[in-house]
Amino acid sequence: MNNIWWQTKGQGNVHLVLLHGWGLNAEVWRCIDEELSSHFTLHLVDLPGFGRSRGFGAMSLADMAEVVLRQAPDKAIWLGWSLGGLVASQIALTHPERVQAIVTVASSPCFSARDEWPGIKPDVLAGFQQQLSDDFQRTVERFLALQTMGTETARQDARALKKTVLALPMPKVDVLNGGLEILKTVDLRQPLQNVSMPFLRLYGYLDGLVPRKVVPMLDKLWPHSESYIFAKAAHAPFISHPDEFCHLLVALKQRV
């Protein structure tokens, strides 16, 4: 069985695992890893099939979560950005004893728009899947541009994301397609009503992929969770607002 790429740094008494989003890899955290590793034992992970975690094909969300768990510390705060938020949520649902707290960043329990539920239109996700087969580098770049649109530092932030993608070999098309399939089909809104560990949800006010309208809806559905909106961020608040982002995580550490 293949192992995934996993790097541990820092000596904090609380473990923090960072899970990246679709099409990316753990290099995306380099803007905050020094700061966080001074407070936590930090675990940087390339999800199966992404970055340096080669030798994996497309996977279901449940299988992806199991592969990640194999190398994880016994207990940690799990932070997932975007698609990574679904992986962290899945782990909280199936292995709650391994999760000290869960943090989702610019993530939704249901990325796809449904009846009376704001999200990405399913035909947009299907379009991305179609375009992947035609020109996947350009498709990934378009997806990255969407993530930073509207922020004061949009161009700079998009460059940072693109650099992360290009730093390592591109994931295979079937892996990228599998990730989009998870975004298109998974719905964890009801199951996550039952988690009892501390649950922090972070959002960007300008996010074009996870509409801010979901925030009050989830506040109501999950009264045990807390939400925070970065007023001038889009889909990658840790890149546009690194200090504020780290401050929230250090504050969470005091509470777990």
UniProtKB/Swiss-Prot annotation:
Where on the tree of life does the source sit, at the highest rank? Bacteria
> Pfam families given for it?
Abhydrolase_1
- Subcellular location, record wording: Cytoplasm
Q: Name one GO cellular component term.
A: cytoplasm
MF terms from GO for this chain are: pimelyl-[acyl-carrier protein] methyl ester esterase activity
Which reaction is recorded as catalysed by this protein? 6-carboxyhexanoyl-[ACP] methyl ester + H2O = 6-carboxyhexanoyl-[ACP] + methanol + H(+)
Gene Ontology annotations of biological process type: biotin biosynthetic process
Its UniProt pathway annotation is: Cofactor biosynthesis; biotin biosynthesis
Q: What is its EC number?
A: 3.1.1.85
Q: Give the positions the UniProt entry annotates as the active site.
A: S82, D207, H235
Q: Which family, according to UniProt? A: Belongs to the AB hydrolase superfamily. Carboxylesterase BioH family.
Its biological function?
Answer: The physiological role of BioH is to remove the methyl group introduced by BioC when the pimeloyl moiety is complete. It allows to synthesize pimeloyl-ACP via the fatty acid synthetic pathway through the hydrolysis of the ester bonds of pimeloyl-ACP esters.
Subunit field text? Monomer.
Q: What is this protein called?
A: Pimeloyl-[acyl-carrier protein] methyl ester esterase
Species annotation: Escherichia fergusonii (strain ATCC 35469 / DSM 13698 / CCUG 18766 / IAM 14443 / JCM 21226 / LMG 7866 / NBRC 102419 / NCTC 12128 / CDC 0568-73)
What gene name is listed for this protein? bioH
